[in-house]
Amino acid sequence: MPHKDNLLESPVGKSVTATIAYHSGPALPTSPIAGVTTLQDCTQQAVAVTDIRPSVSSFTLDGNGFQVVKHTSAVGSPPYDHSSWTDPVVRKEVYDPEIIELAKSLTGAKKVMILLASSRNVPFKEPELAPPYPMPGKSSSGSKEREAIPANELPTTRAKGFQKGEEEGPVRKPHKDWGPSGAWNTLRNWSQELIDEAGDIIKAGDEAAKLPGGRAKNYQGRRWALYTTWRPLKTVKRDPMAYVDYWTADEEDGVSFWRNPPGVHGTFESDVLLTKANPKHKWYWISDQTPDEVLLMKIMDTESEKDGSEIAGGVHHCSFHLPGTEKEEVRESIETKFIAFW
């Protein structure tokens, strides 16, 4: 649970008022996308969101759970053009390796593997929902069990939003992309390549889980962490990202919405943490974010779970509406979720 006492003072920057759609449940969304975008069963609260300019460098991944860094991608210059950002070959051969090197240089990790690449290039639209039902638990997620997909058919890097008809827009509901249980289940199920890399970690985690206090108290294996990067494809004028300083949130602020993605052993239980309101939350954003300003956010970090740790863990985040920007160009972005090993 976050407990750091020496919180960084808010920098001098613009503070805007945003309406945050905190989860207040219960509801059973019709899909994982609906789970993190529906405004049904939400408590709308006005919050202050502080601009990290001009003190961008004061906020770091280990210090706050998020960081904005300068990084120029080759995809932003000739011979590439705007369409190259959604070209799967360019992404795989040019952009993904750039993110891996950036991740290693920032975190000091020895190994980085990209799990998911996403493109967002349409306006926010709330999905259609079924009537409200109790929030699903692990054993009642409503998804039908599927046969195991052959290991060699499940790539470590999956992609969404790049093909016509699967476009996605901003996510207005605050969340974390994985909860602790879902993160560990992802480690042991996502792809054979990931399982092979993390074999010793999985074993150490299983041993720790058997002891009083579970993995969070007893894990002694290699450090590993999940992150997401967010790069706008043009200067952000609408629907910017907002993120909560890790130390101002409580463990109880996240409510698991369970989902069943495909894995090498069949479908497995994973979760998104939907964010409940907490008056302690301190929200931040960066104004007029440009394509060479990459936002990185932690999703989870085993180092942060140790007793007395001063290493930040995963942060709640979402996009938010800036009044008066309705006629601005639609926000476009590329997201990359990756796992790091030390």
From Swiss-Prot:
Belongs to the asaB hydroxylase/desaturase family. This is Gibberellin cluster GA4 desaturase. The gene is DES. Residues 127-183 are annotated as: Disordered. GO terms for molecular function: oxidoreductase activity. One of its GO terms (biological process) is gibberellin biosynthetic process. PANTHER family: BLL6449 PROTEIN (PTHR34598), OXIDOREDUCTASE AN1597 (PTHR34598:SF3). It comes from Gibberella fujikuroi (strain CBS 195.34 / IMI 58289 / NRRL A-6831) (Bakanae and foot rot disease fungus). GA4 desaturase; part of the gene cluster that mediates the biosynthesis of gibberellins (GAs), diterpenoids that may provide a selective advantage during infection of the preferred host plant, rice. Gibberellins (GAs) are diterpenoids and are synthesized via the mevalonate pathway. Biosynthesis of the major metabolite GA3 (gibberellic acid) from geranylgeranyl diphosphate (GGPP) requires 13 steps. Keywords: Oxidoreductase. Signal peptide: none annotated. Pathway: Plant hormone biosynthesis; gibberellin biosynthesis. NCBIfam families: CmcJ_NvfI_EfuI. It comes from the Eukaryota. Its EC number is 1.3.-.-. Disruption phenotype: Impairs the production of GA3 and of its immediate precursor GA7, but accumulates GA4 and GA1.
